[in-house]
Amino acid sequence: MHDEVNPPSDAALHRPLQAWQVMLGGICGLVLTIGLARFAYTPLLPAMQAQTGLNDAAAGALAAVNYGGYIAGALVAAWMDDVRWRHRFYSAGLWMALLTTAAMALSSWWPAWALWRFLGGLCGATGMLLGSGLVLGWLMRQGRRPELGVYFIGLGLGIVVSALGAKWLSAVWPEWSDQWLAFGVMGLVFFVPAWLWRPPVPPAPAAAAVAAAPPQLSRRWMWTMALSYFAAGWGFVISATFTVAIVEREPALAGQGAWVWALVGLAAMPAVFLWDRVARRLGDIRALMLAFALQTLSIVLPAVSGSLLAAFVGALGYGATFIGIVSLTLALVGRRAPNNPGKAMARLTLSYGAAQMLAPVVAGVMAQATGGFKGALWLTAAVMLAGMALLATLPDEG
């Protein structure tokens, strides 16, 4: 007589996720949707230009299309109320990030590249906004500290993976298309935990309880935060877009660009822990003002010195501060809108994205007119100081 084999119960199949699983899954999701789907383009661009004849104007247009995709994703997220649809869109973003990264290898036709870069930008929005909103909502429902510092390790790790991965892949597979395909395969390593450990959709009673919490977002507060976050986006994209170019244009620093970009990511990873601690001690607004001040200094350094030390210190300062500004700002606005943190984050991010589209154009025109980036760096420092002044008008958040 054979023993009857009972199927596993629903409880066994759907065990509650642990905090480390949700965080690690979110980190892997960020590496996939930001580090690969968005940032792999930066270190792979030189090979694409050398081997396909892609000129600077067309390369810049692809970057703009990518930012356009990010803005489109932020717009969708800003008007998405149903948590189930936010969860579905985030899940689709994980698949799209994997496929669009590999698809870049299939053709050297510019319109095809533009399509994949647009979708890659869309994926970035799902990881940055929907993923962070889902994780923050899960933390609040579990009664845990509603901070996103650990989650945003994925941003720094994504930069490191894209920078060092491209350097290694170029030595093994010199062809640009092989490198894109290899990044797509590499994405599977991050896709699996990101997919398996997605924050679950809250049950109806929990969702209703959170939805009952009144939002704490006055119009003046939101506009002030949006304008200061615009300044942060300006500072972020100038360094993210031109750091490698600025370094490579210094004769004494030629060939060091990829290492400087990797240093940005290495600085960002531990910094997220530090900024959460700083915010607990000083309050969120004061911590943000400190991050703005330090990032301004890191932007000015390459403008006043062309030394390798200035490039490295500037990269360290930039990596350590941009991640703090993003993490503290999104967590702050998410806590003030517990019924739909992802939606509130997305609306704020529209100003950050607008700066990402405008700033490179202004900086590029200034660099073309002056023959260098110093003027653009000084303008960026002024914009960052204006953002810090706006923050000073807000009541502190302890």
Language-model features: where?
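C-terminal transmembrane helical hairpin of 12-TM major facilitator-type secondary transporters
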Residues: 285-329
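Helix-to-loop junctions at the C-terminal end of transmembrane segments
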Residues: 73-85, 271-283, 367
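A late C-terminal transmembrane helix in Major Facilitator Superfamily
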Residues: 339-372, 380
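Extracytoplasmic gate region of multi-pass secondary transporters
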Residues: 42, 221-262, 269-270
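Conserved MFS/SLC helix-loop-helix module at the cytosolic interface between two early adjacent transmembrane helices
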Residues: 72-109
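Cytoplasmic helix-loop-helix junction between adjacent transmembrane helices
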Residues: 116-154
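Paired small-residue
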Residues: 111-120, 309-317
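Helix-loop-helix hairpin linking two adjacent transmembrane segments in secondary transporters
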Residues: 110, 141-199
